[in-house]
Amino acid sequence: MADITDIKTIIYTEKTLGLQEQGVVVIQTSPKVTKNGLKEVLKEYFGVTPLRINSLRITGKVKRFRGKVGQRDEIKKFYVKLPEGVSLENTEA
């Protein structure tokens, strides 16, 4: 099961601010979080039942530093459609 500590941040960019007008919030989490796990966390900690959840997995880029090969962390983003008039900003966690 997912935990509140698995949610890293809510993403605020030009694209996501436009989506927020439509009631969609973009949340960045660790890769192990599932849709059902995120739904449970939103219900438990924020008291919000999402209407729809879409997920997007982003693999870490391979980078070189001083001749050594490394890889950035993988992340997972969720596009969460909230009921009309509800936002995560006006709820207490």
UniProtKB/Swiss-Prot annotation:
GO MF entry, a single one: rRNA binding
Signal peptide residue numbers: none
Gene3D superfamilies: 3.30.70.330
Keywords: Ribonucleoprotein, Ribosomal protein, RNA-binding, rRNA-binding
Pfam families on file: Ribosomal_L23
Keyword Cell membrane: no
UniProt key word RNA-binding: yes
Biological process according to GO: translation
Family: Belongs to the universal ribosomal protein uL23 family.
Function: One of the early assembly proteins it binds 23S rRNA. One of the proteins that surrounds the polypeptide exit tunnel on the outside of the ribosome. Forms the main docking site for trigger factor binding to the ribosome.
Subunit-structure text: Part of the 50S ribosomal subunit. Contacts protein L29, and trigger factor when it is bound to the ribosome.
HAMAP family (alphabetical): Ribosomal_uL23_B (MF_01369_B)
Protein name: Large ribosomal subunit protein uL23
Organism: Campylobacter curvus (strain 525.92)
Gene that encodes the chain: rplW
